[in-house]
Amino acid sequence: MSSLSILHLLLLLLALHAPQAKGLPVVTSRTPYSMLMKEIMDDLKKITPSPEGSLNSDEKNFLTKESLLQANLKVFMTFATDTFGSDSKIMKNLKEFQPVLPTATPTEDPIFIENKNLGDFRMKLEEYLVIIRNYLKSKNIWFS
């Protein structure tokens, strides 16, 4: 056996006999936000009509404000719960974004989604997901 092989074996044995850290476990998995967004988009395409028209500048402005990211998420989650149910994949995936968005107290009202208008919901949520992706990337929270 070569000395390099013996060294590797000794390192392995040392690692196995090393004392275990006490306290919280080290989290090695990361939430795959890109996959969550893809699942939301795939579900939206299956269950909602293609959006007609486009967002006006005021709507885009409401979606991009960092102080409204959490409030806007709540609007999308409420619509998703009311429309698809609290156990829907869209709702569950949206909920995953709550811990990573800023919780600033908004000074303005969040985005408005027309009542029971799936096209409006889809159009605004698609834009919102792009904004969230950019926000997470800017904070180095984005995980593929």
Curated annotation (Swiss-Prot):
Annotated signal sequence range: 1-17
InterPro entries xrefs: 4_helix_cytokine-like_core (IPR009079), IL-3 (IPR002183)
Subcellular location: Secreted
Family (UniProt): Belongs to the IL-3 family.
A biological-process GO annotation: positive regulation of cell population proliferation
GO cellular component, one term: extracellular space
UniProt xrefs under Pfam families: IL3
Listed PANTHER family: INTERLEUKIN-3 (PTHR48489:SF1)
GO molecular function: cytokine activity; growth factor activity; interleukin-3 receptor binding
Assigned keywords, A-Z: Cytokine, Growth factor, Secreted, Signal
Protein name stated in the entry: Interleukin-3
Subunit composition and interactions: Monomer.
Function, as annotated: Granulocyte/macrophage colony-stimulating factors are cytokines that act in hematopoiesis by controlling the production, differentiation, and function of 2 related white cell populations of the blood, the granulocytes and the monocytes-macrophages. This CSF induces granulocytes, macrophages, mast cells, stem cells, erythroid cells, eosinophils and megakaryocytes.
